[in-house]
């Protein structure tokens, strides 16, 4: 389990809920959780949406999410 997935589940969010709030596809969230690279702006949106539920900011850099340009 990735740190991102752990935080998402601790926040009580499903993949679908987070993808809707972050305005990214379910596939993007699934890739992040499988430690596959995604575009940096999408990773940032996912982290911003997750941060709102956690009550503190997390970034894709600190979570080690792999990104491509």
Where are these regions (language model features)?
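Short, charged recognition helix plus adjacent turn
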Residues: 10, 31, 40-41, 56-69
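Long, compositionally biased, intrinsically disordered segments
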Residues: 15-16, 30
């Amino acid at each position: 389990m990735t740190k991102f997935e752990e935080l998402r589940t601790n926040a009580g969010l499903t993949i679908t809920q987070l993808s809707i709030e972050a305005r990214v596809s379910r596939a993007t969230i699934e890739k992040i959780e499988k430690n596959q690279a995604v575009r940096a702006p999408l990773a940032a949106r996912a982290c911003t949406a997750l941060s709102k539920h956690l009550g503190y900011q997390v970034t894709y850099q600190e979570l080690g999410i792999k990104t491509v340009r």
